[in-house]
A protein has these predicted regions:
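Long, domain-scale functional regions
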Residues: 64-66, 71-92, 103-107, 111, ...
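N-terminal single-pass transmembrane signal-anchor helix
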Residues: 4-32
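Sec-dependent signal peptide cleavage junction
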Residues: 27-43, 431, 435-439
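Membrane-proximal N-terminal amphipathic helix
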Residues: 38-64
């Protein structure tokens, strides 16, 4: 009787397995390459679409005489799961998009892609760890430097800074969003994203400097509020006008976790002398950025006058101050703009002939800029040195110029801190929806 349905022999089974293995060896890489190329093409298409829409947006804004910057979020709602850092610059009317992928696009990036040409390359993110080391690693990558909005300034210190309309410099700090100004030596410098409130930099009795305050940070009323109350938790009197006019203190405070990360830093509080023509040219309102930066760290104090009702305080002047919380410098604001002119002239764009501030350059593509009018100003740290007065401080106006006001005026306060050298970045991409987490 014959066997029906004879099974496979061991040799035949082994042969089948070998054949299947060969098929897999040949087919799987091709399938993988197909999937990879499809993802790459899709990612490149996204960059081209953003560039095309950015150019349309630019035309619309020009018709409306709107000189504001254009960011990726103005163009399209990107899926945070699959898209990370995104930035837009313009070469004339040509939009250039830099885009980093994550999720299904992990490891892909486009640098300066246009609507007609966007080539995706592969990029590897640095390992999380010490914050300064992580940011320096981002800067050292040609791709990540661009997509994260990093640069080195043109000062002798060559500080790494974040620039542009919306770079990836958000951090979760004090259970709220702050932003990284840059890396200064071994410290990361932060500034609060939202204003804390409007306060005088300093005020005084009517018999002292005509009631307009004293432009010496080590004794300033705002210094007392930021370090004794906002940081220290002990109530102080807050001021909002001339002649020691009081106001309600802001309710914000720093929690214990945030305070543990803040360095007791020696801040430079040098004054900028408005009559120094290497810094300020009064006839053209030109302000030399590097010279201004050096003066912020210089030896001039806010009192170069010797007499007068605006110059009769007896306060000892200093050019450094050790403490926890202060304010940004005017040059921090200038270098936050990606406009190249701001590296040499903080007040570029001023129309001297018509005394017009409508087209100020450094407010453009500047993540740190606040406001749009002359009356929406933010206090800076440095005193303003001028003959005849000892009560004037530098600030940045909403119209986009550095300026000076009496210290007693109530302007917007954006606290700034330096982090301890060992603070780590443990996760996040630096976007507002996925800020860096510090530890």
């Amino acid at each position: 009787m014959k066997n029906k349905g004879r099974g496979f022999t061991l040799v035949e089974l082994l042969a089948v397995i070998v054949i299947l293995a060969i098929i897999l060896v040949i087919a799987v890489p091709k399938i993988t390459d197909t999937i990879k190329n499809s993802k790459k093409a899709s990612f490149e298409s996204s960059a081209k679409t953003i560039a095309a829409q950015a150019e349309k947006k630019k035309m619309e804004k020009e018709i409306l005489e709107d000189t504001g910057s254009i960011s990726c979020s103005d163009i399209v709602k990107l899926n945070d799961t699959d898209y990370g850092n995104c930035s837009i610059t313009f070469d004339g009317n040509t939009a250039k998009v830099s885009l980093v992928g994550k999720g299904k696009f992990e490891g892909l990036s486009v640098i300066n892609g246009t609507k007609d040409n966007a080539t995706a390359g592969e990029v590897k993110m640095p390992e999380y760890g010490k914050g300064t080391t992580y940011i320096k690693a981002l800067y050292d990558s040609d791709i990540l430097r661009v997509t994260n909005g990093l640069k080195k300034d043109n000062t002798s210190d060559a500080n790494i800074r974040y620039e542009g309309a919306n770079p990836n410099n958000y951090v979760s700090f004090n259970d709220e969003l702050w932003r990284i100004i840059g890396v200064f030596g071994d410290n990361i410098k932060l500034v609060r994203t939202e204003e804390l409130g409007k306060l005088s930099w300093d005020s005084s009795d009517s018999s002292v400097n005509d009631g307009y305050g004293v432009n010496e940070w080590s004794q300033a009323d705002l210094k007392e509020y930021l370090n004794t109350m906002y940081y220290g938790g002990t109530s102080v009197t807050c001021y909002g006008g001339r002649n020691n006019s009081t106001t309600t203190c802001p309710t914000g405070s720093l929690n214990s976790t945030a305070k543990s990360m803040i360095n007791n830093y020696t801040w430079n509080t040098g004054a900028i002398n408005s009559s120094d023509t290497t810094i300020v040219i009064q006839e053209t309102f030109t302000v030399n950025t590097v010279a201004f930066y050096n003066a912020e760290r210089g030896s001039v104090t806010g009192k170069i006058c010797t007499s007068g009702s605006d110059c009769n305080d007896t306060v000892t002047r200093t050019t450094t101050w050790p403490g926890y919380v202060a304010l940004p410098y005017a040059t921090d604001w200038a270098y936050a703009s990606s406009e190249t002119a701001c590296a040499t002239n903080i007040n570029d764009g001023y129309d001297v002939a018509n005394n017009n501030f409508d087209n100020m350059t450094c407010k453009k593509n500047n993540w740190m800029h606040h406001g749009s009018t002359r009356y929406e100003a933010m206090w800076m740290l440095s005193p303003y040195a001028r003959s005849g007065v000892a009560n004037v401080v530098w600030n940045v106006l909403g119209v986009g110029s550095v300026n000076s006001f009496r210290a007693s005026l109530a302007l917007s306060v954006f606290p700034s801190v330096y982090l301890n050298t060992e603070v780590k970045i443990t996760s996040g991409s630096g976007s507002s929806s996925d800020p860096y987490i510090l530890k």
